[in-house]
Amino acid sequence: LLTQYRMAPQIGSMVSEIFYDGKLKNGEREIKDIYKTSPSALNNVMSWIDTSSLGSKSYHQKEEFGTSIYNTSEANIIIDLLKQISKNEKFISALSDLDKDGDSSIGVICMYAAQRKLLQQKFREIDWSDEFKSMIKINTVDGYQGKENRIIIISMTRSDSSKNITQFMKRPNRINVALSRAMDRLIIVGSGQMWIDKNSELPMGKALDYIKNNQSNGCKVFDIDNEYSLLESGDG
């Protein structure tokens, strides 16, 4: 049997179910209790912020030159999340104490290079504290192999009315990397509609399903329209 010590049990169990036929067991690992004072967006171990209800506003755009895609709505949501987290100074300093040895505490994984570019650009436009800035890392899934962060935010990026998923997003190892980098908290931002029906058997469809079915166990699906305002209110 394989045992993993990196991920919180909920994340480990999901990864085990999707990629290892349930054979990956969770080792004992203490999750630091800094999350007791964390912003409300981090109350759950795993969250999916579902952008479907934004309709066509949730759709991705294609780069003018090049083949990559980006998604402005998702980028804005992620910047809002980071703002909410950054305002909670008590939490930030606790997080920063845990990760003194230099690894970023919060990783943003983009499924497409153009989305990384957009997010880095939006991130640079904001006046963050130096401490917070050094805690954030924004990269593509392919740049993430072998790394881990306490908190991972994934930008799914792809969203349209055809719901066609490209090969790129079907590759289990790629999705496995994205989902298994998170040690304590995993937030997925993207259209849930893309991953039901014909795509529900793909790894990301199974992830959405897992989060939906474990809402009493530290997982939650937020509807961007109705419930996202909950994420905004209250700082922990």
Task: Label every PLM stretch briefly.
Residues L1-K32, M111, M194-W195:
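Conserved coupling/interface region of RecA-like P-loop/ASCE motor cores
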Residues Y5-A8, A113-R116, Y144-Q145, R158-S161, ...:
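Conserved nucleotide-binding/hydrolysis micro-motifs of P-loop NTPases
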Residues Y5-A8, G12, A75-I79, M169-L179:
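Amphipathic alpha-helical transducer elements in NTP-driven molecular machines
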Residues P9-Q10, K57-Y59, K117-L118, K147-N149, ...:
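Switch/connector loops and helix/strand junctions flanking conserved nucleotide-binding motifs
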Residues K23-Q121:
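Conserved helicase/translocase motor-coupling segment
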Residues K25, G107, E125-T140:
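Conserved RecA-like helicase motor-core motifs
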Residues L98, D127, S161-G236:
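Helicase C-terminal subdomain and adjacent C-terminal extension
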Residues N139, G143-S159, N176-V177, R185-V189:
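A short beta-strand element within the Helicase C-terminal
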